[in-house]
UniProtKB/Swiss-Prot annotation:
It is found in: Cell inner membrane. Keywords: Antiport, Cell inner membrane, Cell membrane, Ion transport, Membrane, Sodium, Sodium transport, Transmembrane, Transmembrane helix, Transport. InterPro entries: Na+/H+_antiporter_NhaB. It catalyses: 2 Na(+)(in) + 3 H(+)(out) = 2 Na(+)(out) + 3 H(+)(in). NCBIfam families: NhaB, PRK09547.1. It is a multi-pass membrane protein. Belongs to the NhaB Na(+)/H(+) (TC 2.A.34) antiporter family. This is Na(+)/H(+) antiporter NhaB. Na(+)/H(+) antiporter that extrudes sodium in exchange for external protons. It comes from the Bacteria.
Length: 524
């Protein structure tokens, strides 16, 4: 039947998203300018932040780039922020964008090796509890040297590989469309697939939390860690040792949570790998091993060598993370014989939509800065007593990181703490303790939602999430035990262990106070 032009426009707007969702976005776009001009720019700013979080929460209804982008464009158009401020935020976070564009694409060209290693791991460890612990530990270790996004990209690649192998076998698809379950025609196969999805969901969440457990420990683990370390004048070893009073107890209890939720099948964990899936993966592995030519074996060896280069380059910070990723692309494609432009393009398909989304997010961050949305909170915290400041900085960082971006929150708070030190409001010792509280506050409680951790948001908006039915709400629910334990143990560490342990480490000669002058930290 014929439809009117108005109906055609409405159908095209945000595509197949539900009508109620389309109406909600339209409502936001109508209300925001009215509130900004006739009520309060501050209120309008917070409304924009909440609306953007809503688009992230509804990521499976509609990719957040479009609705979030419309809100961001309007915010710039009505004067909530300026194009210059947005460009400045993008420039400040160029390292993160380069990471997404190049590092994630670089990992794509190492998928053969990763799938080989993790398939062996999965098939040889039959205990789900031990396997979950192995994934969590591996992610934590890798995240201490690589960026968490890189690690999540690795695990996503592996999980998509597992899912594709089984789905193609059980659905008999000639076109290999892994999003279409119509080829699975019996109830048993459907139930097995659902169990396999639950199994992969739990592994992904363990790996995701593992990136937070490891990423908080070192100055290269997360982008904001590097900013905090630079402000405090710490090198790699200084940063690691100063964080230990808080990060070590959190790490131990985080692993304990991993074991308990698997053992007692809590919060959606505990799903076993179906035996039928194990058989399919085992047969695939045996066939792949039998068919593997010398040329393919050499590709695996080359990828392993490139993997060593990747870890060393990042651990020693030989170049910016994104540039290291570019070197991985060049080395892997050169020595594995991938020279076709079309083949190269596939590597960027996963990362570029998220890169665009993160750029939109920086526009929202520009609004937060322009409208001083966090200023009242920061002023309140700095008015507290020195002993209360540590816990308040930790808690407010955690709260804001859960609804905002932890890179932004960490940067804002360390700059405010640094400014307070330079103006004589806090002492040097207090500033360094605040730096620890800020770092742990931005990294630990932020696992509560995908908004705080870029790695979690990347997972939520990846091609894997809809395949394994990993929604925003399910991620929050499955992260809950980790969130509670990591936040509470981290708070107790900041409250009771940080000061005495730092004093003991200083007396033992493990750490020394830097001399900070003219805005530059210079270790003795």
């Amino acid at each position: 039947m014929d439809i009117t032009n108005r109906q055609a426009v409405l159908k095209n707007f945000l595509g197949n998203s539900p009508d109620w969702y389309k109406l909600a976005i339209m409502g936001f776009l109508i209300i925001n300018p009215l509130v900004f001009f006739f009520v309060s720019p501050f209120v309008a700013g917070w409304m924009l932040v909440i609306e953007f979080i809503f688009t992230l929460a509804m990521a499976l209804k509609c990719y957040p780039l479009q609705p979030g982008g419309l809100l961001a464009i309007q915010a710039v158009a009505i004067g909530m922020t300026s194009p210059h401020q947005v460009a400045e935020e993008i420039a400040n976070n160029l390292e993160v964008l380069l990471l997404l564009v190049f590092m994630v694409a670089g990992i794509y060209f190492m998928k053969q090796l990763l799938l080989f290693v993790f398939t062996k791991l999965l098939l040889n460890i039959r205990s789900k509890t031990i396997l979950s612990l192995a994934f969590c530990l591996a992610s934590a270790f890798l995240s201490a040297f690589l960026d968490a996004l890189t690690v999540i990209a690795v695990v996503i690649s592996v999980s998509v590989g597992f899912y594709t192998i089984y789905h193609n076998v059980t659905s008999n698809h000639s076109d290999k469309d892994i999003t279409d379950d119509s080829g699975i025609d019996n109830q048993d196969s459907h139930e097995t697939l659902e169990q396999f999805r639950a199994f992969l969901r739990s592994l992904m969440m363990h790996a995701g939390v593992g990136t937070a457990l490891g990423g908080v420990m070192t100055m290269v683990g997360e982008p904001q860690n590097l900013i905090i370390a630079k402000s405090a004048g710490w090198n790699f070893a200084d940063f690691f040792i100063r964080m230990l009073p808080v990060t070590l107890p959190v790490f131990i209890f985080g692993l304990l949570v991993c074991l308990l939720v698997e053992k007692f099948k809590l919060f959606g964990y505990g799903a076993q790998l179906p035996e039928r899936v194990r058989q399919v993966l085992t047969e695939y592995d045996q066939q792949a091993s039998a068919k593997r030519t010398k040329q393919e074996k050499m590709k695996l060896i080359v990828q392993a060598i490139i993997g060593v280069w990747l870890v060393l380059a990042l651990a020693l910070h030989l170049a910016e993370v994104g540039l290291v990723g570019l070197s991985v692309i060049i080395l892997a494609t050169s020595f594995c014989g991938i020279t076709n432009e079309h083949s190269l393009g596939k590597a960027f398909q996963e990362a570029l939509p998220f890169t665009a989304l993160l750029t939109v997010f920086f526009a929202v961050v520009a609004v937060i800065i322009e409208q001083s949305l966090f200023t009242p909170i920061i002023q309140f915290v700095l008015q507290a007593s020195p002993s209360a400041q540590l816990s308040l900085f930790y808690l407010f960082n955690g709260l804001l990181s859960s609804v905002s971006d932890n890179v932004f929150v960490g940067t804002v708070y360390i700059n405010e703490a640094r400014s307070a030190f330079e103006h004589g409001i806090v002492s040097l010792q207090q500033f360094e303790l605040l730096a620890v509280a800020i770092n742990t506050g931005t990294n630990l409680p932020s696992v509560a939602t995908p908004n705080g951790q870029a790695a979690f948001l990347f997972l939520l908006t990846s091609a894997l999430a809809p395949l394994i039915r990993l929604s925003y709400g399910r991620m929050v629910y499955m992260a809950l035990p980790y969130t509670l334990v990591m936040t509470i143990v981290g708070l107790l560490g900041v409250e009771f262990l940080l000061v005495p342990m730092t004093e003991w480490l200083t007396q033992a000669g493990w750490i020394s106070l830097p001399h900070i002058t003219n805005g530059v930290a210079i270790p003795h």
